[in-house]
């Protein structure tokens, strides 16, 4: 029994040693790394915000050209990438929360279990406990919902653009089909006119094949013009929806990301500086003793 107790005590002491001499410095370096990461993200999102804010000064000449297949595929690819961005963003926030929650939970258990008197923790225990508690509090209050909604709203905008481009593509095919049918009937009309040009086409019933063909061709001409007008309107709608929605949604998106990354950067920087100052203070005290 005594041997078992000594073994447990030895193991506990080793865990405490690893926690204080190995885990704590690594966590501090991780916090420092997260500070640098979010500072880089903050600076990048600031630049992106400045760029997209210039969209309101962009004057474009309305194009009558239909959206190309390459353009449509690029829009679909952008939508896919933003979906992945939203998924990855939500995952990384959840992973950070899960990580620090598990770490803080384990630390609380280890402090209560390994320390006979929880009110008299050593300075090393206090440092790692303080670090994890502040970290836990920081990730709990970061404004990830605002940033997530910003990405999701932009995704909705892209979805609307994709739908409109699809409608335009359908109208383009209808226009092309109407034009081909019209051209086909014009060719047939010319053939009939050439065939019956040398004599009267009126039969016993008084029917005129050429006249009937001309009526049909005129009907198809009107149909082709109508479909072309619809296509031009659809192209104009696509351009308007794309430009207006991007001008409105992109600044909101990157402003949300600037806000999120700013909070993360400052929170992690504050935690790191506080813990580093504590470490320097403790080092000075050891030297003076």
Residue ranges and their predicted role:
Residues 1-289:
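Extended alpha-helical coiled-coil scaffold domains characteristic of the BAR superfamily
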């Amino acid at each position: 029994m005594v041997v078992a107790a000594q073994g447990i005590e030895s193991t506990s002491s080793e865990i405490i040693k690893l926690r204080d001499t190995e885990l704590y410095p690594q966590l501090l370096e991780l916090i420092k790394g997260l500070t640098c990461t979010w500072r880089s993200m903050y600076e990048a999102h600031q630049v992106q915000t400045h760029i997209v804010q210039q969209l309101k000064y962009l004057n474009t000449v309305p194009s009558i050209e239909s959206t190309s297949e390459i353009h449509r595929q690029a829009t679909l690819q952008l939508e896919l990438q933003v979906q992945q961005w939203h998924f990855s963003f939500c995952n990384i926030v959840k992973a950070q929360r899960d990580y620090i929650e598990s770490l803080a939970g384990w630390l609380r258990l280890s402090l209560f279990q390994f320390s006979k008197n929880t009110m008299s923790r050593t300075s090393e225990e206090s440092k790692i406990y303080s670090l994890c508690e502040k970290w836990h509090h920081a990730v709990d209050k970061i404004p990830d919902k605002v940033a997530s909604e910003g990405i999701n709203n932009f995704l909705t905008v892209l979805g609307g653009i994709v739908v409109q481009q699809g409608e335009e593509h359908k109208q383009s095919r209808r226009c092309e089909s109407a034009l081909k049918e019209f051209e086909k009937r014009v060719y047939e009309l010319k053939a009939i006119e050439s065939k019956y040009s040398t004599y009267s086409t009126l039969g016993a019933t008084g029917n005129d094949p050429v006249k009937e063909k001309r009526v049909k061709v005129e009907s198809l001409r009107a149909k082709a013009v109508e479909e072309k007008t619809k296509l031009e309107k659809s192209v104009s709608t696509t351009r308007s929806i794309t430009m207006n929605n991007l001008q409105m949604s992109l600044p909101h998106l990157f402003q949300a990301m600037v806000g999120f990354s700013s909070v993360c950067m400052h929170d992690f920087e504050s935690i790191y500086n506080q813990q580093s100052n504590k470490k320097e203070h403790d080092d000075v005290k050891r030297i003076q003793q």
